[in-house]
Amino acid sequence: MTAKFTDYIVKDIGLAEFGRKEISLAETEMPGLMATREEYGPKQPLKGAKIAGSLHMTIQTAVLIETLVALGAEVRWVSCNIYSTQDHAAAAIAAAGIPVFAVKGETLKDYWDYTAKLFDWSDGGTPNMILDDGGDATMFVHQGLRAENGDTMFLDQHNSEEEEIFFALIKRILKEKPKGYFATLAKNIKGVSEETTTGVHRLYDMEKAGKLLFPAINVNDSVTKSKFDNLYGCRESLVDGIRRGTDVMLSGKVAMVAGFGDVGKGSAASLRQAGCRVMVSEVDPICALQAAMEGYQVVTMEDAAPIADIFVTATGNKDIITIEHMRAMKDRAIVCNIGHFDNEIQVATLKNMKWDNIKPQVDEITFPDGKRMILLSEGRLVNLGNAMGHPSFVMSASFTNQTLAQIELFQNQGKYEKKVYVLPKTLDEKVARLHLAKIGVKLTELRKDQADYIGVKVEGPFKADHYRY
């Protein structure tokens, strides 16, 4: 008799059937991942791969996980945000016998405890690959090894509640695990593929400092990720989160978007399409000029604070909306973030204010003068905390890139140095090509003489690496 599978933590395993139905629907909308299963499944290119995955545990991610398994990998999974898990998706993955540790609304302590579970394989082994979103799984290994090697002073110098919890976990592991635990982890990991802008920044910082422990592929800057997921995904999911959270009429409201990168562009478009009058702030003169040429009013946060009804941060930076900005806002202004971390808004400064929880991930905060502010998802990702994240189709492109990156790193161990790489343009174009038929796109084909005339191959790639799209 087979032992009952118990290597998981989910909210309710009884949600598995519901999750499985939604996974089936998502598969129809994820042609890239399904084509990848069909092409690579017989070859089993990930056989022997033990992937530690830290990425929002959604229905779409479930399709990614099962694609990795179909290609031969063993997988353990956690969510990379305390509010982004879809509990029915986690239940379906657990019911399929895949270890997953993710609950929507989990505490920060739970979040980091679950992250630690990623690295404790049930057979006593360790992972040999990381699939990351935001870099927390990667940082777990790097900061753990740093402390294990004797540099422990930073463990007592936390700058946030989350850092305090994370550093306490490292201290505990150093006491409980055999000596050399983190060194073994670092040695066994052959590479990481990183999903998002914030995590990529962390990787490049470590590479620049000479501290990157294993090769990395920057999936975020694949064109079929950043120009689609970041842009078109946010264009659909931002207003979904705001509407589900507040039921507010968006048409006619004044909205302020901080940042006009790909995520900011999608966010501004989302609000404009909903009928908002949109303002934008930027530090980059090129992005500021782009925003102005698109017809947005480009202002500072100081200008916008007393005027806007809705505020969205999309910068990947810290302290974008400060306590001073919040004090200057209208009564019941709506404040949210669509960047990866919660420090874009100075939520920690609100700790001693009066908090009234209206419903999950919607809080009304009252200032000493009686003014109120509506904060969504405690300043964490609004589209995943208050809604269901990006649609399946656009996530198919991102996750096909992730799958190809995992195959590339695992199949070519020793080829890559401890640096950050991007996938070649041939694969970027392949990912795009896999999604065309689903939406009825017919490509024009170059003749040989036309290809020769512009100096490309008939089958591509069609653009130079420096082309910006």
Swiss-Prot record:
Entry keywords, A to Z: Cytoplasm, Hydrolase, NAD, One-carbon metabolism
Pathway: Amino-acid biosynthesis; L-homocysteine biosynthesis; L-homocysteine from S-adenosyl-L-homocysteine: step 1/1
Cellular compartments annotated: Cytoplasm
Cellular compartments per GO CC: cytosol
Cofactor binding, note field: Binds 1 NAD(+) per subunit.
Family note: Belongs to the adenosylhomocysteinase family.
UniProt-recorded name of the protein: Adenosylhomocysteinase
Lineage: Bacteria, Pseudomonadati, Pseudomonadota, Alphaproteobacteria, Hyphomicrobiales
Gene this chain is encoded by: ahcY
